[in-house]
Swiss-Prot record:
<dbReference type="GO" id="GO:0005737">
    <property type="term" value="C:cytoplasm"/>
</dbReference>
<keyword id="KW-0862">Zinc</keyword>
<dbReference type="GO" id="GO:0008270">
    <property type="term" value="F:zinc ion binding"/>
</dbReference>
<dbReference type="InterPro" id="IPR050076">
    <property type="entry name" value="ArchSynthase1/Queuine_TRR"/>
</dbReference>
<feature type="binding site">
    <location>
        <position position="275"/>
    </location>
    <ligand>
        <name>Zn(2+)</name>
    </ligand>
</feature>
<feature type="binding site">
    <location>
        <position position="280"/>
    </location>
    <ligand>
        <name>Zn(2+)</name>
    </ligand>
</feature>
<dbReference type="InterPro" id="IPR036974">
    <property type="entry name" value="PUA_sf"/>
</dbReference>
<comment type="pathway">
    <text>tRNA modification; archaeosine-tRNA biosynthesis.</text>
</comment>
<feature type="domain" description="PUA">
    <location>
        <begin position="596"/>
        <end position="671"/>
    </location>
</feature>
<dbReference type="Pfam" id="PF01702">
    <property type="entry name" value="TGT"/>
</dbReference>
<dbReference type="GO" id="GO:0003723">
    <property type="term" value="F:RNA binding"/>
</dbReference>
<dbReference type="InterPro" id="IPR036511">
    <property type="entry name" value="TGT-like_sf"/>
</dbReference>
<feature type="active site" description="Nucleophile">
    <location>
        <position position="90"/>
    </location>
</feature>
<keyword id="KW-0328">Glycosyltransferase</keyword>
<protein>
    <recommendedName>
        <fullName>tRNA-guanine(15) transglycosylase</fullName>
        <ecNumber>2.4.2.48</ecNumber>
    </recommendedName>
</protein>
<feature type="binding site">
    <location>
        <position position="192"/>
    </location>
    <ligand>
        <name>substrate</name>
    </ligand>
</feature>
<dbReference type="InterPro" id="IPR002478">
    <property type="entry name" value="PUA"/>
</dbReference>
Length: 674
């Protein structure tokens, strides 16, 4: 028996999406990837030339056709369909769902797929239609699970798909995913969702996918079966789907339909060709209409594949740039029912956040109230609790240009005129000279001045004309945050913008604070926000006189922090994160209780970690569940001895599941650790 195991590695992350690579006997596939459906006896398009790294064909059709079967057994499926790269084969489950029965067993179809030398084979699952009775779904599920187990035992020279079923019962989807994961398949398709997409039930599709994801491992690719329209690719990718298969490109073409990233166009309605692909550049609408139907269908199918592959490429780039959710929101606004799907996805904020990177290359653009559910917003509100009040008074100012510390003092403090009532308060107090100062803004609500250069609080934009949902959201944040203070003073613009009540106009002269923050206090706020309450004091000791701060000559931002000429931390220029140095790592390790911020490595990995070598996933024994990609982490052994420190390349959940690839990019000790 040849033990073939999928080798999958994540390269880039955004939301739950992954740009990754997995190896097969016939090549490496970059995900997300589209698998065009290739009919074993009818294919006319060169899908490899159009961009296909991987295709899917039906082993049952080959099995039932004696001529195709003979050639496949003698020459292999790659020769049969003339495709040299990775091939996945379906098992006949689709025919089973259509005709109710097929004349091949689960074991036979696995053995046949091995015999024709496919790269990825599929067990004979039971596709359960949406909205069936629960008893039927449960019975089908048990058969699917049993067949997944049988396939894992039977297969040898084959990468194996195990399909998640469960109809429209979310708990059954999760149960199936957990059960089939026990048998360590190589890829996990999510099946029987085509009817949901055909009925535009995208909210139910999101439930089916997200509950499936809860039970699936992070270290294997996931395939959304039958998802062939480019308008759904971005949403599905954001949920963690890596592979898609499409017969839609030819099915739509046969009906003179042009697929686009935001919908479908009918040839009969067009006066201009819709894109800049070869077909649309070389042919006019009238020429296509006058053409033989078969030739026309082939050309439209080529257009459809071009659009589909272009969308996959755009999604990959959006993941690399940290802009996937902006693209998802754009795509989902192309159809009301897709927007239903996005709004249902908002209910899975915790699932999304645990896999979302802490920092990204691109700014956060607020495009509608759905943006409020993006992982960055709830994470900020959670981390905001790490910063405790320093005074009993709070002053809330409107947003200005960024960074706020450069402009709010000039705009709202120095321009204050006692004769013109400008502020509202919850008390009669007029002395706010000693106050915490924050800015109220969409989408993050409350931004302390010390965090105004930290990602994503410094890197975000929202429209100047605000929607009611965001106003209500920010108002609730302001009201809850204000409860921490005895006296709260709010600028009139904030009161009016967010319709805040229960605050009275102050007509007496006020003593206002200077809306600035010292570099030392900024460092403490960032440390508390990034690592946990009290981390600032642990790192910097509470004595400002002992700390030396070096700034960039060009930007005037903090770059390096020292105590007695020994580097504690550095500040990353692009996102404001604190990067630990030797002394900072030691102090943070001493302060934080186990397992906070820690990655525990095996004994074999200890000497390499001490030398500053990267930590690989297979050597990680445990890690703090709150670790996210791009976080600064401490590397320790099982006895909690500090070995090294560095940047996480994956979230804790991914680190625990993966046995290949890097987990931590380790920073080298400047001095040998004691």
């Amino acid at each position: 028996m040849v033990d073939i195991i999928v080798d999958f590695e994540i390269k880039y992350k955004d939301a739950m999406a992954r740009v990754g690579k997995f190896k097969t006997p016939h090549g490496t596939v970059t995900t997300p990837a589209l698998m065009p459906v290739v009919h074993p006896g009818k294919q006319t398009l060169d899908v490899k030339k159009l961009g296909a790294q991987i295709v899917i064909t039906n082993s049952y059709i080959i099995y039932k056709n004696e001529e195709l079967k003979k050639k496949a057994l003698e020459e292999g499926v790659h020769s049969l369909i003339d495709f040299p790269n990775t091939i996945e084969t379906d098992s006949g489950s689709f025919q089973l769902s259509v005709y109710g029965d097929i004349d091949i067993t689960n074991e036979e179809v696995i053995k046949f797929q091995e015999a024709i030398k496919t790269d990825i084979g599929t067990s004979l699952d039971i596709p359960t239609a949406p909205y069936v009775k629960r008893e039927e779904a449960e019975n089908d599920l048990e058969i699917t699970i049993e067949r997944a187990k049988e396939a894992a035992n039977v297969k040898s020279d084959l990468l194996l798909n195990s399909v998640v079923q469960g109809s429209t019962f979310p708990d059954l989807r999760e149960k199936c995913a957990k059960e089939i994961s026990k048998y360590d398949a190589d890829i996990y398709p999510i099946g029987a969702v085509v009817p949901l997409m055909e009925m535009y039930r995208y909210a139910d599709l999101v439930d089916a996918v997200m509950y499936s994801m809860r039970g699936l491992p992070e270290n294997k690719p996931r395939h959304l079966m039958g998802a062939g329209h480019p308008m759904v690719f971005a949403l599905a990718t954001a949920m963690g789907c890596d592979l898609f298969d499409s017969a839609a490109y030819i099915l739509y073409a046969n009906k003179d339909r042009f697929m686009m990233p935001d919908g479908t166009l009918r040839l009969e309605d067009l006066i201009e060709m819709p894109c800049s692909c070869r077909v649309c550049c070389e042919y006019t609408v009238d020429e296509l209409k006058q053409m033989d139907q078969k030739k026309r269908a082939k050309l439209i199918a080529e257009h459809n594949l071009h659009i589909s592959f272009a969308e996959i490429r755009r999604i990959r780039q959006a993941i690399v740039d940290g802009e996937l959710m902006k693209l998802v929101e754009l795509r989902c606004r192309s159809h009301p029912f897709l927007l239903d799907g996005l709004r249902r996805l908002m209910e899975y904020k915790e699932d999304m956040e645990r896999l979302n990177p802490s920092s990204k290359k691109s700014a956060f653009f607020y495009t509608g109230y759905e943006s409020l559910a993006r992982s960055e917003v709830p994470k900020h509100l959670k981390q905001l609790e790490n910063i405790k009040p320093k005074n009993k008074n709070l002053v809330i100012l409107p947003h200005t240009r960024k960074p706020y510390t450069k402009y709010v003092n000039r705009e709202y403090i120095k321009k204050y005129t006692p004769k013109i009532p400008t502020y509202y308060s919850n008390t009669t107090n007029t002395d706010y000279s000693n106050s915490d100062v924050v800015v109220a803004d969409i989408p993050f609500g409350i931004i302390p001045l010390g965090l105004d250069e930290f990602y994503p609080l410094a890197q975000n934009e929202s429209p100047s004309i605000h929607d009611l949902d965001s106003k209500r959201f920010i108002r609730d944040i302001i009201n809850n945050y204000s409860k921490k203070y005895d006296n709260v003073l709010i600028h009139r613009k904030v009161i009016e913008k967010f319709d805040i009540t229960n605050f009275n106009l102050i007509e007496d002269e006020l003593q206002l604070p200077e809306a600035k923050i010292s570099d030392f206090n900024r460092l403490n706020d960032i440390a508390d926000y990034q690592f946990g309450c009290g981390a600032g004091n642990a790192l910097f000791g509470g004595d400002e006189d002992k700390i030396t701060i070096e700034k960039s000559r060009k930007t005037k931002k903090i770059r390096h922090v020292f105590e007695d000429n020994e580097n504690i931390v550095n500040m990353r220029a692009n996102d404001g994160f604190l990067i630990l140095s030797d002394l900072g790592a030691k102090r943070l390790h001493k302060f934080l209780e186990y397992p906070h911020n820690r990655v525990v490595v095996s004994e074999d990995s200890e000497p390499f970690a001490l030398k500053g070598k990267s930590v690989f996933n297979k050597f990680v024994l445990d890690c703090d569940e709150n670790i996210r990609r791009n976080d600064e982490v401490l590397i320790v052994n099982k006895d909690d001895k500090l070995l090294a420190f560095g940047k996480a390349l994956l979230s804790s959940y991914e680190i625990k599941d993966f046995n290949t690839g890097q987990a931590i990019k380790t920073r080298k000790w400047k001095k040998e650790i004691e």
